[in-house]
Amino acid sequence: MARFFQSAVKNTIIFSTALFSAFTFAQSKLAIVIDDIGYHPKEDAEVLAMPKEISVAIIPAAPYAKIRNQQAKAQNHDILIHMPMQPVSNIKIEEGGLTLGLSEAQVNERVKKAKSIVPNAIGMNNHMGSAATADATLMTYLMTALREQHLFFLDSRTIGKSVAGKIAKEQGVRVLDRHIFLDDSDNLADVQRQFQSAIQYARK
């Protein structure tokens, strides 16, 4: 989401505020999560100035992760840990992320460390993770750790064959799926169309 906000965040703030007003009236529910918080002070500040109904997902390895956790909490935003996870591609992920082959103890330790950096988090979603969320062993270890930390999991659905939701339910972890990416395109009109698609989905 950060790429889009660099060019269009002011317009998005107005648009999203109007959407939330409409949704309150219609008694429908739309959850919006803005990812990649913790790297860019200006963009982060613009996101945190948005209505409190918008959730923020903080990357624990980001340089401003701790202060963004405090600021988001002070402004009554729900907070998620945006946990880096191994993708199918060879893109390198941030330090402390989840990769294939980690032991259960290693996964547990990384989740605990992430929670210590973002202590006000109520859940976790995946940053990338197309390989990680399709791996049953890694997801089993992750859901065990999330259950111990009393965190839910939001599957960003970066791959169609994700097993995260299935394993979360088996492990007794609350799980949600991402349905629509708002910023597949950086064009404001495209993002607005995605918002409208999100509204229609929520009203089903």
Ranges and model annotations:
Residues M1:
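Basic/polar, cationic surfaces and motifs that engage anionic cell-wall
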Residues F4-F5, T12-I13, A26-K204:
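Catalytic-site microenvironment of enzymes
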Residues K10-L19:
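Hydrophobic helical h-region of N-terminal Sec-dependent signal peptides
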Residues S21-F23:
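N-terminal signal peptide c-region/cleavage motif recognized by signal peptidases
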